[in-house]
UniProtKB/Swiss-Prot annotation:
It comes from Aeromonas hydrophila subsp. hydrophila (strain ATCC 7966 / DSM 30187 / BCRC 13018 / CCUG 14551 / JCM 1027 / KCTC 2358 / NCIMB 9240 / NCTC 8049). CDD domains: UBA_EF-Ts (cd14275). SUPFAM superfamilies: Elongation factor Ts (EF-Ts), dimerisation domain, UBA-like. Its main location: cytoplasm. GO terms for cellular component: cytoplasm. This is Elongation factor Ts. Residues 80-83 are annotated as: Involved in Mg(2+) ion dislocation from EF-Tu. Associates with the EF-Tu.GDP complex and induces the exchange of GDP to GTP. It remains bound to the aminoacyl-tRNA.EF-Tu.GTP complex up to the GTP hydrolysis stage on the ribosome. Belongs to the EF-Ts family. InterPro entries: EF-Ts_dimer_sf, Transl_elong_EFTs/EF1B, Transl_elong_EFTs/EF1B_dimer, Transl_elong_Ts_CS, UBA-like_sf. The gene is tsf.
Length: 293
């Protein structure tokens, strides 16, 4: 029998999200060959999908698609980066975003209830893949935008953007979608920054100035200039254009005779609290449980 190291068990666990004892057993059966162990584990993934539903799905892929004057983006989650690259998972995501675009579905529940094209609903198709692969998955959100000048951009499968322009071109819309993906603006224009956000930032900047030794009156005057810079930094039109930093996005739009109506940016797992596990503590807990059995 091959000598299975703890490091090898840990690597297999990280790549498959399977339990420590399951990983050790799989490696023993594969004589220490981790790739063979992964293949065997995937083939034997017969666990019921219901057992996976409570696990946190914070990895995944953003899928985007344009159909005529409709642009759609979805976030499909899974538990591990390993599964986010699985061919079956990717094919399913592409089909789901196609369904959303062609049928103009903008609601997650409605999309889950839609026919996948195999006589089963989208939700049931996801459930079947959960049972086959052996980890939780979730269709988390969908965004649909209609308009004439739409741009979509997906960066590294993890960040997706839809932009909608008045005027301009689809190419400009795509360039701006790329910019939003890279620079994460929170608002379209500086004047769109909410009073609440401005007030909070002003308070922070005044405290910083006072703590540096400035009198309150001088600190407040200093902050006015900083606030203008702040609203520009957090708004799309106030930022230097990613493909030509010598001009702002506002200057680019003026040159192209266009305006930004809206943008939506998805990033995989944002807002989902990932569960962090102490590997050594988990090993100790599982050994203790095994000794009690």
């Amino acid at each position: 029998m091959a000598n299975i190291s703890a490091a090898l068990v840990k690597e297999l666990r990280e790549r498959t999200a399977a339990g420590m004892m399951d990983c050790k057993k799989a490696l023993e059966e594969a004589a220490g060959d981790i790739e063979l162990a992964i293949e065997n584990m995937r083939k034997s993934g017969q666990a019921k999908a219901a057992k996976k539903a409570g696990r946190i799905a914070a990895e995944g892929v953003i899928f985007a698609r344009t159909e005529g004057n409709v642009a759609v983006m979805i976030e499909l989650n899974c538990e591990t980066d390993f599964v986010s690259k699985d061919a079956g998972f990717l094919a399913m995501g592409q089909k789901i975003v196609e369904i959303a675009a062609t049928q103009k579905i903008a609601d997650v529940d409605a999309l889950k209830a839609a026919d996948f094209g195999n006589g089963e609903s989208v939700e049931l198709t996801i459930t079947n893949l959960i049972a086959k692969i052996g980890e939780n998955m979730n269709l988390r959100r969908v965004m649909l935008v209609e308009g004439d000048n739409l741009g979509t951009y997906v960066h590294g499968s993890r960040i997706g953007v839809i932009t909608k322009l008045a005027g301009g071109s689809d190419e400009l819309a795509k360039d701006l979608a790329m910019h939003v993906a890279a620079n994460s603006p929170q608002f379209v224009k500086p004047e769109d920054v909410s009073a609440e956000v401005v007030a909070k930032e002003r308070e922070i900047q005044i405290d910083i100035a006072i703590n540096s030794g400035k009198p309150k009156e001088i600190a407040e005057k200093m902050v006015e200039g900083r606030m203008k810079k702040f609203t520009g930094e957090v708004s799309l039109t106030g930022q230097p254009f990613v493909k030509d930093p010598s001009m702002t996005v506002a200057e680019l739009l003026k040159k192209e005779g266009a305006d930004v109506v809206s943008f939506t940016r998805f990033e995989v797992g944002e807002g989902i609290e990932k569960q962090e596990t102490d590997f050594a503590a988990e090993v100790a807990a599982q050994i203790a449980a095994a000794q009690k059995a």
